[in-house]
From Swiss-Prot:
Gene: fliM
Membrane-crossing residue ranges in chain numbering: none
Annotated localization: Cell inner membrane; Bacterial flagellum basal body
Membrane topology reported for the UniProt record: Peripheral membrane protein
Function: FliM is one of three proteins (FliG, FliN, FliM) that forms the rotor-mounted switch complex (C ring), located at the base of the basal body. This complex interacts with the CheY and CheX chemotaxis proteins, in addition to contacting components of the motor that determine the direction of flagellar rotation.
One GO CC term, this protein: bacterial-type flagellum basal body
Species classification: Bacteria, Thermotogati, Thermotogota, Thermotogae, Thermotogales
Entry's Gene Ontology BP terms: bacterial-type flagellum-dependent swarming motility; positive chemotaxis
Known partners and oligomeric status: Interacts (via N-terminus) with unphosphorylated CheY. Interacts (via central domain) with FliG (via central domain or via central domain and C-terminus).
Protein name, as recorded: Flagellar motor switch protein FliM
Organism: Thermotoga maritima (strain ATCC 43589 / DSM 3109 / JCM 10099 / NBRC 100826 / MSB8)
Family according to the record: Belongs to the FliM family.
Length: 328
């Protein structure tokens, strides 16, 4: 297309400038953006946009499966957000905290190794909750052999989820080669090799941490032909998608949730709270014959009547809350 404007186009441009619909700075900025396109020779792009998009889809599937798995293990809803970046192996190693939980793994069809790295705050919080603790105040020290052995099994399960997410492109059986806590001792590829870094932001409540998966280019290069939207669409059979959705539905039904029967609530002044003693009676705004509120994960869900069942306190569900706060 020619860069020369017609007289009519010139008149329209001048009219837009006079009316303030278009600013001169915008034209200059647009022209400047067209002239210069930065390129980092130290970090050349090894992957096409299509391959990166497919890689993102693979690991978003992994993120959803990881969210379901962690929600079951930690007994609360865990949100997992996936992001992907391209950088050198040296830059990745420098970004890893010391100490950290670094798992070097491979697959039966891979030529080379990859890295699964978990931040220690997540490592110790998850370990403590699995062992029956509250998961608070994680220490900042290298894990012991016993702690490593327990969490190694958890990472093995997570790597299995990762392999399942890859199965539409390349089925592989993951295996752990080694575990380290100091990134300076981990050298799986040359420092200047390009790697794809998959970062999973793991959060629940006020807690947030990260899991990183580092894929070296040399390991992925033989698979690049399969990393395309076309291949992905051809490999996705409707019955297979439905089968996986059913698996996710079944897995989600096993996630434990907290159910609370709220007998009543009231408001007290700070002085009244400070003056409370053993034996004091606090009046609630609920009559003993009234229905009580039943919360699921802190949100009103049902109404019920308290009572006793087989020698234990219980509550009978009598109605359900609607979106407006009323109940049926």
């Amino acid at each position: 297309m020619s860069d020369v404007l017609s007289q009519e186009e010139i008149n329209q441009l001048i009219e837009a400038l006079m009316k303030g619909e278009l600013k001169e700075e915008d034209l200059l900025k647009e022209e400047e953006e067209k002239k210069v396109k930065p390129y980092d020779f130290k970090r050349p792009s090894k992957f096409s946009k299509e391959q990166l998009r497919t890689f993102q889809m693979i690991h978003e599937n992994f993120g959803r499966a990881l969210s379901t798995y962690l929600s079951g293990r930690l007994r609360t809803f865990v949100d997992v957000e996936i992001s992907i970046d391209q950088l050198t192996y040296e830059e990745f190693i420098r970004s890893v905290m010391i100490p950290s939980f670094i798992v070097i793994f491979t697959g039966d069809v891979f030529e080379g190794s990859a890295i699964f790295e978990m931040r220690l705050d997540l490592f110790y919080t998850m370990l403590d909750i699995i062992m029956g603790g509250p998961g608070e105040n994680p220490p900042n020290r290298p894990p012991t052999e016993i702690e490593t052995s327990i969490m190694r099994k958890e990472v093995t399960n997570m790597l299995t989820l990762l392999a399942q997410a890859w199965s539409d492109f390349q089925y592989f059986i993951p295996s752990i080669e080694n575990v380290e806590t100091n990134p300076q001792f981990v050298q799986i590829v040359p420092p200047n090799e390009i790697v794809l870094l998959v970062t999973a932001s793991v959060s629940w409540g006020e807690f947030t941490s990260f899991i990183n998966v580092c894929w070296p280019f040399s390991l992925l290069e033989p698979l690049l032909e399969k990393l395309s939207d076309r291949f992905w669409m051809m490999g996705r059979k409707p019955e297979k998608v439905e089968e996986r959705m059913e698996e996710l539905r079944k897995a989600s039904q096993k996630i434990p949730v907290t159910v609370q029967a709220v007998i009543g609530e009231t408001e007290l002044r700070l002085k009244e709270i400070l003056d409370l003693e053993v034996g004091d009676v606090i009046r609630l705004g609920t009559h003993y014959k009234d229905e009580i509120r039943i919360d699921v994960e802190g949100r009103p869900k049902f109404r019920g009547i308290p009572g006793v069942f087989k020698g234990k306190y219980a509550v009978k569900v009598t109605g359900e809350f609607t979106n407006g706060g009323e109940y049926e």
